């Protein structure tokens, strides 16, 4: 898809702040600092539309970005960051649950995993949780440019095994630095719209 327009639309601390359901939505979810915002920025050919930070836990709201005035990219707060209060973690969980359970226009949830390290227990739990909603889930392994070429096949096999993926289940390898996986990811998104 050629992105001709991408704009920030809203940040929601509460489900009542979600924009109206006018367009199909693609959600992006993953642990803190796995590269969610960088992935979004790479897909839309912008450097700073989705805020990136080296400090984990910066995305504390659900952020909606309107793409080509026809599609929302939805950046969900990162999970698994221990340096926030239990109350804040619970608030994030409730907000994300409200989003995932209420949005009729949600077409795909993209679960982002750090390809350098593979899935952590929290990633496996999130994958199972997303599957409970009976909507499409796509796995994307980011930062693959940092995995040595002679270790990539082994890393992908390990990720597929840890997540108990079937042969037909897709796992996209992605790099914001090189653009690897960008076209493949866009093709999957376009096929769902």
UniProtKB/Swiss-Prot annotation:
Belongs to the TRAFAC class TrmE-Era-EngA-EngB-Septin-like GTPase superfamily. EngB GTPase family. This is Probable GTP-binding protein EngB. Its cofactor is Mg(2+). Transmembrane segments: none annotated. The gene is engB. GO terms for molecular function: GTP binding; metal ion binding. Residues 22-193 form the EngB-type G domain. Keywords: Cell cycle, Cell division, GTP-binding, Magnesium, Metal-binding, Nucleotide-binding, Septation.
